[in-house]
Amino acid sequence: MTKVAINSKKAPKAIGTYSQAIKKDKFIFLSGQIGLDPNTMNLVDGINNQIHQVFQNLIEVISASEATISDVTKLNVYLTDLENFALVNEIMKEYFAEPYPARAAVGVASLPKGALIEADGFLVLD
């Protein structure tokens, strides 16, 4: 099977030379999402809102790939301030059920458009 680009009109358009996701066989690779409102392409205000927007954007891309958030097996989270790590954990519980995906949380100096958080992931379909 060839790789297929996945794009959702309900998630922010790519701001570079990448697809929102790529599907190959039973694997889906999600590009990073930041807290962009897909209607305005502007960042939502504050870390709390950005975390929610990131997960909502990921869900829209996942839905466009005919999968669900429960198919996420690995999640990578990038934070400009690791003091927000506990808040990410708290909000993740609203979107993911146990068993939670494997995850990395990485502190970074900056993110595109001045975002406070970015997340990407990997899915395996049955």
Model-identified regions with their sequence ranges:
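Short, polar/acidic, helix-capping and beta-turn segments at strand->helix junctions
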Residues: 2-126
